[in-house]
């Protein structure tokens, strides 16, 4: 198997996973701090999706730390295929959650001008949480792309 930048068991892979954890946790934190987020199904789905992404990325970051400390090779076909499936599933869930939440934010901000009339409505927090979820998705997309190419090189 090829050693690609950002693959499992590499320093760049660990940094990608830490970035995914950090941006997913930040997205959850900002969304939970917003008032009345639980009224909207898309925002609840965003929190659930980012929570799953946080757990998945944290688990793989721990595995990367284990591999780096013990000089273990994580690039065998069975492990990499598990990484590919997990990354692609969480990537699709995260993209769907980010897009649906962005749709709700655009609806409130631009279409019905709800954010302008309701000054206590936390639209800025919703926007920041959605932006962070897209940052998370970009990092997941990079990870899933790299692991897919590692699996394809077998």
Swiss-Prot record:
What is the topology of this protein in the membrane according to its UniProt annotation?
Multi-pass membrane protein
The UniProt keywords, alphabetically, are:
Cell membrane, Membrane, Transmembrane, Transmembrane helix
Where exactly are the transmembrane stretches of this chain?
Answer: 11-31, 43-63, 78-98, 130-150
Q: Does the keyword Amino-acid biosynthesis apply?
A: no
Provide one Gene Ontology cellular component.
plasma membrane
Q: Does the keyword tRNA processing apply?
A: no
- Which InterPro entries does this UniProt record tie to the protein? CASP_dom (IPR006702), CASPL-5 (IPR045009)
- According to the UniProt topology, which residue ranges lie Extracellular? 32-42, 99-129
Q: Provide the free-text tissue specificity comment from this protein's UniProt record.
A: Expressed in the stele of the root.
Question: Which stretches are Cytoplasmic in the membrane topology?
Answer: 1-10, 64-77, 151-154
* Pfam families, A to Z: CASP_dom (PF04535)
- Name the principal localization, coarsely classed: membrane
Where in or outside the cell it occurs: the entry states: Cell membrane
Q: Which PANTHER family match?
A: CASP-LIKE PROTEIN 5B2, CASP-LIKE PROTEIN 5B3
Q: Which family does it belong to?
A: Belongs to the Casparian strip membrane proteins (CASP) family.
Whom does it interact with, and what assembly results? Homodimer and heterodimers.
Query: Under what name is this protein listed?
Result: CASP-like protein 5B2
Q: Which organism is it from?
A: Arabidopsis thaliana
């Amino acid at each position: 198997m090829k050693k690609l930048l950002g693959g499992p068991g590499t320093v760049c892979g660990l940094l990608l996973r830490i970035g995914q954890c950090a941006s997913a946790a930040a997205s959850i934190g900002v969304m939970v701090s917003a008032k009345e987020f639980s009224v909207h199904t898309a925002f609840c789905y965003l929190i659930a999706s980012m929570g799953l992404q946080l757990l998945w990325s944290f688990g793989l970051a721990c595995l990367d730390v284990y591999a780096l400390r013990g000089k273990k090779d994580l690039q065998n076909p069975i492990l990499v295929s598990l990484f590919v499936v997990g990354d692609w599933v969480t990537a699709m869930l995260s993209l769907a959650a980010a897009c649906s939440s962005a749709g709700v934010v655009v609806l409130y901000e631009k279409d019905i001008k709800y954010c302008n009339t309701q000054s206590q409505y936390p639209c800025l927090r919703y926007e920041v949480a959605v932006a962070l979820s897209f940052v998370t998705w970009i990092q997941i997309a990079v990870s899933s792309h790299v692991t897919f190419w590692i699996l394809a090189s077998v």
